[in-house]
Amino acid sequence: MHAQVQTQEHSASGSLRFNGIGKTFPGVKALDGISFVAHPGQVHALMGENGAGKSTLLKILGGAYIPSSGELQIGEQTMAFKSTADSIGSGVAVIHQELHLVPEMTVAENLFLGHLPASFGLINRGALRQQALACLKGLADEIDPQTKVGRLSLGQRQLVEIAKALSRGAHVIAFDEPTSSLSAREIDRLMAIIGRLRDEGKVVLYVSHRMEEVFRICDAVTVFKDGRYVRTFDDMSQLTHDQLVTCMVGRDIQDIYDYRGRPRGAVALRVDGLLGPGLREPISFDAHKGEILGLFGLVGAGRTELFRLLSGLERNTAGRLELRGHELKLRSPRDAIAAGILLCPEDRKKEGIIPLASVAENINISARGAHSGLGCLLRGIWEKGNAEKQIKALKVKTPHAGQQIKFLSGGNQQKAILGRWLSMPMKVLLLDEPTRGIDIGAKAEIYQIIHNLAADGISVIVVSSDLMEVMGISDRILVLCEGALRGEVSRDQANESNLLQLALPRHRADGVAN
């Protein structure tokens, strides 16, 4: 996949080795004899389902945890990190999802926190600025060192974190889900920087659930399962998406999508000549009872905009909707919910969950109005029972229903949002990127829930930018491009080529065809 920029000297003296690493917590063996090697001049992915042990291993590498067994080597030297300071001092940097920067301090102050240049007991602001500019050069030239970190975008903060690591002489750099909240442009920039780190001979570890990123930037991948080492693939050019998924979950890729053919029912939702914000041409289609209808398109195709119209978040300027044979006018999301059209939004952290509320509160919040007449006592009993019912039915992994939802994994947060809608009368479910940022095991569970809903007669419409996903779970696929419906493809006829031909703007599609 990528040329390895490494020498024999690098390979002998700078490799990162995990030798039989184990970590036990009371009653839990988080890691069990992990052994593998990551080389300089490589981007080495760590993959596995949630709970596989990836984050625990990074915490050991970063000095936050002390291993219960085994040893860590960098080059020929055995490391015994007892703190994060030990790890940093040995040239290791771990870039976590939650960045360790102080928002109220400037970029320059964050870069040199703990060793600020000083003269006569006072911070030398001139020297600090010059040193900060040197750190940011070629990495984030547009960032003013005097800007407070809290005013930067998430992508810019990440660049500051990387600059900070490099300023401390890091030669082993680990990224933990670095793109989970970045825009497409920020992801491209990060990929270029990681490629540069590889070319400079750094050891780069990369933890991600996103297959496309792993195949795009990584030279090798090691798979974990249930805290154990499974396998290392050293040649990405010989590895397929399906092989990697099967290795991670122990099942064939088609078993993960769990497709079940079913007879198509009557029309549940009829969309006739719909126009509104973000749509360039009138859109018409039918969605049937018991059907999973896929919506595919590239960024800017109008998929999310269509969902906003169908869920009452935006008002249509033309066209009409029918729900099970009756005309439907949507003036607000409340109208859609009352009619039984429910939306799981794309950005679950901003639009789906209430982070500081409990799992139970997140599940019950939309159904409270329907049970307001019960009185406090009876409503409390119903809410407790409903939350426990949904947690059990959807296999939401949480210590208890009162746990704040922000502490759950992305997959379990998504299942809790689905539990919210399962608590209410539903006719049509709109799922916008339902498995984005979720590990492959949780994806399989989400797919199972989707199929169960369709089997119960619900019309499920799924927006996904993942071609494999939309082909794997859908009965039919509608393709949008630049705010217009370009075509419909049956499950039997769908393949990557014909879906992309429809999804690409005409001039780009012609170029692909030629």
Swiss-Prot record:
Regions annotated as coiled coil: none
Keyword Transport: yes
Pfam family, one: ABC_tran
Bilayer topology annotation: Peripheral membrane protein
Positions bound to ATP: 48-55
Entry EC no(s): 7.5.2.12
Catalytic activity: L-arabinose(out) + ATP + H2O = L-arabinose(in) + ADP + phosphate + H(+)
Domain ABC transporter: 16-251, 251-507
Subcellular location: Cell inner membrane
GO cellular component: plasma membrane
Keyword Protein transport part of the UniProt annotation: no
GO molecular function: ABC-type L-arabinose transporter activity; ATP binding; ATP hydrolysis activity
Predominant cellular place of this UniProt entry's protein: membrane
Superkingdom per UniProt: Bacteria
Keywords: ATP-binding, Cell inner membrane, Cell membrane, Membrane, Nucleotide-binding, Repeat, Sugar transport, Translocase, Transport
Binding partners and assembly: The complex is composed of two ATP-binding proteins (AraG), two transmembrane proteins (AraH) and a solute-binding protein (AraF).
Membership in a protein family: Belongs to the ABC transporter superfamily. Arabinose importer (TC 3.A.1.2.2) family.
PANTHER family, per database record: ARABINOSE IMPORT ATP-BINDING PROTEIN ARAG (PTHR43790:SF6), CARBOHYDRATE TRANSPORT ATP-BINDING PROTEIN MG119-RELATED (PTHR43790)
Function according to Swiss-Prot or TrEMBL: Part of the ABC transporter complex AraFGH involved in arabinose import. Responsible for energy coupling to the transport system.
Protein name: Arabinose import ATP-binding protein AraG
